[in-house]
Structures are given as structure tokens and as C-alpha cells.
Amino acid sequence: MISVNDFRTGLTIEVDGGIWRVVDFQHVKPGKGAAFVRSKLRNLRTGAIQEKTFRAGEKVAKAQIETKTMQYLYANGDQHVFMDTSSYEQLELNENQIEEELKYLLENMSVHIMMYQSETLGIELPNTVELKVVETEPGIKGDTASGGTKPAKTETGLVVNVPFFVNEGDTLVVNTSDGSYVSRA
């Protein structure tokens, strides 16, 4: 059991029969009344986000999530195949389970598979990935004074707003938490 006062972003808890990851939290101490913790939780089974308020000091169960490092091999229809790098055991995940992460997945990429009591919950991507630009408008010389951006489509289909100097064929470093441009690789 863990106190809600000890909430941290990324903590995994069991509440109301579900497995939830803390996305955001805020300790609130009103002038009148008892303190409480307002939290935003993501259900790891369904991906749904729910806001929940806990009384300060309330205890919740901490979910024991195991992570396995696996390599993404290929897509077979709406099934995506991953391989355990130590045992060579293969695991298939449905497209619905990894819908958000598909925009960043490349073949042979290493990812962490999250498991709870032998049930696969989803995947955890690295903080940044390198993606190749396949389609973007050419940059116009002298158009950089405003520091603007233009859309660029990557090899996975993700559209990222990039600076004007980025061209087709360039490799970008993209933040996987929000899909934003970090730098050129």
C-alpha cells in the first residue's frame, strides 16, 4: 500500500479493479476543510483517462508491473510481433493495445513490454526516437527570420512541425511523449 501523498508521475496503482498510471497529480490544501490530492490517471488496459480525487493520507495498492525488453519485428495485419531478446520468445500485440505508440515504432526497435500478472498491458517507448522525413515542403531561403515551422511527414506516418531548414531525407529526433521535434540526428 502506498499513500496518495507519495504520488509521482508514472506511478502505477490499483484502484476500483483497474490498473492505472498516474499522469498528473496536484496536492490541494484549501483554507477551509481537509487537504486532498487531485489526480489524472490512465487506465493501462483501456487507455482511458480519468480524473480522481483522493483524501490526503488515503492508501491505495501499488501495482507490481514487470517490464521486459523486447524487439519490434514486424506487423502482420493488425497484429504486431515482438521478440524477447534473451529467450527469443515471440509475443503478438493487437493494434488496439499499442495504437498511440505505432506512430513511433520502427522495425528492430527495442521497447519495454509492460506486464501485470502475465497479462500484457502495452509498451513503453524510449524518450526519443529517430525518424526519417519522407515528405515536406522545401525551405525558402530568407524565410527564417520569424523562426516558423512547417509540417513534415515521417516514415511512420507521424506529422511533426519542424523548422524551415529541415528537408526530405533528413533524420529527426522526435519526443515520444508529445510528438514534438527535438533536433536533427
UniProtKB/Swiss-Prot annotation:
GO BP: peptide biosynthetic process
Pfam families recorded: EFP, EFP_N, Elong-fact-P_C
Presence of keyword Protein biosynthesis: yes
PANTHER family, A to Z: ELONGATION FACTOR P, ELONGATION FACTOR P (EF-P) FAMILY PROTEIN
Source species: Bacillus velezensis (strain DSM 23117 / BGSC 10A6 / LMG 26770 / FZB42) (Bacillus amyloliquefaciens subsp. plantarum)
One GO CC term, this protein: cytoplasm
Compartment(s): Cytoplasm
Name this polypeptide is given: Elongation factor P
Gene Ontology terms for molecular function: translation elongation factor activity
Upper taxonomic lineage: Bacteria, Bacillati, Bacillota, Bacilli, Bacillales
